[in-house]
Amino acid sequence: MTDSSPQSNPNAVPGAADVPAAAQGQQQEQRRGGGGGGRGDRRGDRRGGRRGQDRDSEWQERVVQIRRVSKTVKGGKKMSFRAIVVVGNEKGQVGVGVGKAGDVIGAVRKGVADGKKHLVKVPLTRHSSIPTLSNGRDGAASVLIRPAAPGTGVIAGGSIRTVLELAGIKNVLAKRLGSKTPLNNARAAMVALSSLRTHKETAKERGISLEQIYS
């Protein structure tokens, strides 16, 4: 008696019914060119964009003053806007920038970019104050800042207060001397903050121990 069942051919190409569904999906993705790699790369780009936005969002910007200024040229007077902007992250970094443009938005944008180019690192104590007394001068403006006890707050006014708050200082006393110009006062405050040193740095500069600083 002969066997009538069909014999399998090892050289035969398997049909669609013999291929698993997952393998068929992979083949279709390969035919379309690249599979899911493109989508994965796009997701990575989006995540990178969000990280960049998070870095930008930690910076705060405050406009101190916007003035309309003019420049005399050959054809007459050219009008523009000048913006004074303070930029800080409230974690010990702050900068003051000035921007000029034909419109207010452009002037503020340039002021923010200029402020980020002139950042100053401010040493903060555990009570969000400054380690020592300091003073700064810019033009005819002079600013004196001194540390304060916890709960005092920021005792300052005008552009000086804006600089101190965006630097992350929460307990400080400041006094303005001389000119009342917002730009000069803000820059004088920046000079005072840039000259601050921690107790450890002061002890190292003087060549004494840290215990002698506190004694």
Swiss-Prot record:
Family matches, as InterPro entries: Ribosomal_Su5_D2-typ_SF (IPR020568), Ribosomal_uS5 (IPR000851), Ribosomal_uS5_bac-type (IPR005712), Ribosomal_uS5_C (IPR005324), Ribosomal_uS5_N (IPR013810), Ribosomal_uS5_N_CS (IPR018192), Ribsml_uS5_D2-typ_fold_subgr (IPR014721)
Residue spans of biased composition, Polar residues class: 1-11
Regions of compositional bias (Low complexity) in chain numbering: 12-28
Protein keywords: Ribonucleoprotein, Ribosomal protein, RNA-binding, rRNA-binding
Record-annotated S5 DRBM domain positions: 59-122
An individual GO BP term: translation
Compositionally skewed regions (Basic and acidic residues) per UniProt: 39-61
Gene Ontology MF term list: rRNA binding; structural constituent of ribosome
NAD among keywords: no
Coiled coil regions, renumbered to chain: none
Subunit structure: Part of the 30S ribosomal subunit. Contacts proteins S4 and S8.
Family: Belongs to the universal ribosomal protein uS5 family.
Domain free text: The N-terminal domain interacts with the head of the 30S subunit; the C-terminal domain interacts with the body and contacts protein S4. The interaction surface between S4 and S5 is involved in control of translational fidelity.
Name of this protein: Small ribosomal subunit protein uS5
Species of the source: Synechococcus sp. (strain CC9902)
Lineage, highest ranks first: Bacteria, Bacillati, Cyanobacteriota, Cyanophyceae, Synechococcales
